[in-house]
Amino acid sequence: MKVNLDYLGRLFTENELTEEERQLAEKLPAMRKDKGKLVCQRCNSAILEEWYLPIGAYYCRECLIMKRVRSDQALYYFPQEDFPKQDVLKWRGQLTPFQEKVSEGLLQAVDKQKPTLVHAVTGAGKTEMIYQVVAKVINGGGAVCLASPRIYVCLEVYKRLQQDFSCGIALLHGESEPYFRTPLVVATTHQLLKFYQAFDLLIVDEVDAFPYVDNPTLYYAVKNSVKENGLRIFLTATSTNELDKKVRLGELKRLSLPRRFHGNPLIIPKPIWLSDFNRYLDKKCLSPKLKSYIDKQRKTGYPLLIFASEIKKGEQLKEILQEQFPNEKIGFVSSVTEDRLEQVQAFRDGELTILISTTILERGVTFPCVDVFVVEANHRLFTKSSLIQIGGRVGRSMDRPTGDLLFFHDGLNTSIKKAIKEIQMMNKEAGL
């Protein structure tokens, strides 16, 4: 019996394989002892006493969604093999000098096996900057994965790579088609738990985003899914204290790009005092002040993206706006919206003219020529990082590198002030 090639580089529980397949695989203990405690070998979670089964074994509840790991069973993996060497990059575009510098730095990072952080502003063109390093690894027979905590980021990157690379590309998320073996994989960070020493190069985008940030399980998945001599590259527009510390300690090399690809400055948010949003919302009405701003924006004809702090408020706002603006096509998306992918595409295609969203769309999506309003911008869910990312949706297009970015609030807080200050600093660093 031959090994199924789709199994190479993948990690399996005992029950996922036949007896014949298990005999062909390498074996790992499903759990290990660490300071007297049992720890899951797939997700690195400590096993609690209540996770005990009547059969006399423990199981891991943390990664249960990806099939049960039991202490009385093993984990199995099939060592990754090299791919045929191939020339895969179809993209013939031109990088800006700033992008070229980062691209060259990434090629050097591969040669020197130096883990690297790319800190680039929103709209800098991070995707194009990684093309050369991705192509280099694949051209040499290696395996590459681009991972992100957010499904929207994965979908956007996947579409871009399909256009610009000639090899097959596997897209993996909770609702995707089954995996097939290919030298280029796009996956949510949770999907990395299903790989073991599979990739020569792993690029993690949006490393400051939930659910990746401060998640030891996903940090472990990132470490475990890369070959022992493989390389990790991290991309972000809003760095974290932990990443900055690793740069200071020399554990990460930093490459910075403070300028957008079209050379125009980041849009500076404009804070707008709005104290009656909730009072009117509770009456199923729209604040007259907010309505006047929406009226003015709709006369421009540009699409409008409105961020709401909570799902319930977003749903209420959609109903109210639909009454107030009957000629507009309005949508709402959140983490629990079943047709959110379809609505996002409809907004991108111009079929929806106003889209209301929770922070689920704060990053990883591009809507040409869009204006952005944030209501209750001083809500605790809108962190400095979140507000910077939201602001990054505006002015991304060469056709319209400007746009309105309004933060409606009933009291300026630290997050708003720090977000504005950091955006101003990035423009200054870029010489703009």
Language-model regions, residue ranges each:
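Walker A/P-loop
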Residues: 111-135
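Conserved helicase motor
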Residues: 148-156, 160, 170-180, 187-194, ...
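Conserved interdomain linker/interface between the two RecA-like ATPase lobes of SF2 helicase motors
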Residues: 112, 116, 251-314, 318, ...
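Post-DEXD/H (motif II) to motif III coupling segment of the RecA-like Helicase ATP-binding lobe
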Residues: 197-275, 285, 292
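N-terminal pre-P-loop "Q-motif" helix
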Residues: 91-114
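Conserved segment of the helicase C-terminal RecA-like domain
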Residues: 227-242, 391-423
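Interdomain "pre-motor" coupling segment immediately N-terminal to P-loop NTPase/helicase cores
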Residues: 30-82
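Conserved RecA-like helicase motor core of SF1/SF2 enzymes
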Residues: 206-209, 344, 348-401, 409-414
